[in-house]
């Protein structure tokens, strides 16, 4: 399926312009419509405290949130207009602890959502969605853009982290609009062992053949690494290959308000330096 409807989360952070630029580049490459989404994060305070605060405080908080959203929306529209791209912007609201859930709901009505990697130096992290929570909740693929920005290309040289599991299979399928345009694709398996329920007799060969039938130029590689070093080995291979995109399954689940992530997913997200396409 082609990507024709993209959603990008925008905010006031220093990384937002780079994320918007990446989203615009993707929208132009796929002749897709782009929507920006700003979520006004309302303070999550105990009910008894909220009731004690004066009405003027509530009004000022709402006004400041609205003004921040409108400024961010204006910057987004200006960037899209400079690129000659058709785009619109939405503004929604949610409690600080519910921003990820709000973004996930909007993402369900897009082909792809573009999110930002968490920046440890950025203030007010509760006002921004957690990429892993959005991916686990939206049922759509996401591209997570590093907070340091991206290079001149996204998806020309791709590494697929392949373990023959359901999540990786979903990620490869969701990434096909990019993979079919890529100049090179490496299917990378860590510690692969032939098993009837997963890797075949020649690990990676089955998915490589499937991709080749879509016209993808693909190579298969295996790496050996301890369980705790798999993420580091994947990231190292990305750098060696000069890759500009990693495709991987998002492993984990959410229970109540607790997010439980698989080890590789948990380790890759904070360390990534190129965009990561994730699906669950």
Where are these regions (language model features)?
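Structural beta-alpha unit
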Residues: 78-113, 213-246, 253-255, 274
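Generic structural signal for helix capping and beta-alpha/helix-loop junctions
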Residues: 44, 97-99, 122, 152, ...
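Amphipathic coiled-coil/heptad-repeat helices and related helical stalk/stem segments
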Residues: 19, 99, 127, 168-171, ...
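Gly/Ser-rich helix-loop-strand patches that form or flank binding pockets
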Residues: 20-29, 102-151, 238-280
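Small/aliphatic-rich secondary-structure junction motif
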Residues: 1-58, 137, 154-223, 243
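A short acidic, glycine-rich active-site loop
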Residues: 56-71
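Short histidine/acidic/glycine/proline-rich micro-motifs that form metal-
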Residues: 14, 62-63, 93-96, 119-121, ...
């Amino acid at each position: 399926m082609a990507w024709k409807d993209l959603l990008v989360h925008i905010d006031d952070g220093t990384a937002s312009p780079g994320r918007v630029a990446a989203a615009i580049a993707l929208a132009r490459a796929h002749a897709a419509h782009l929507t920006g989404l700003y979520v006004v994060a309302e303070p999550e305070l105990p009910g008894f405290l909220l009731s004690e605060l004066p009405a003027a405080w509530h009004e000022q908080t709402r006004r400041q949130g609205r003004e921040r959203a409108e400024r961010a929306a204006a910057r987004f529209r200006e960037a899209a207009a400079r690129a000659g791209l058709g785009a619109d912007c939405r503004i929604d609201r949610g409690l600080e602890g519910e921003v990820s859930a709000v973004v996930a709901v909007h993402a369900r009505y897009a082909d792809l959502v573009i999110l930002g990697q968490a920046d440890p130096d950025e203030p007010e992290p509760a006002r921004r969605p957690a990429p892993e929570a959005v991916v686990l909740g939206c049922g759509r693929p996401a591209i997570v853009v590093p907070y340091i920005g991206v290079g001149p290309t996204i998806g020309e040289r791709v590494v697929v982290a392949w373990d023959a599991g359901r999540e990786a299979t979903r990620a490869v399928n969701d990434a096909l609009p990019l993979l079919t345009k890529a100049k090179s694709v490496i299917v990378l398996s860590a510690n692969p062992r032939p098993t009837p329920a997963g890797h075949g007799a020649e690990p990676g060969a089955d998915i490589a053949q499937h991709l080749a039938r879509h016209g993808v130029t693909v190579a298969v590689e295996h790496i050996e690494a301890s369980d705790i070093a798999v993420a580091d080995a994947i990231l190292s291979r990305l750098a060696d290959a000069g890759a500009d995109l990693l495709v991987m399954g998002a492993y984990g689940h959410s229970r109540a308000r607790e997010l439980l992530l698989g080890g590789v997913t948990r380790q890759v997200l904070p360390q990534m330096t190129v965009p990561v396409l994730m699906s669950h």
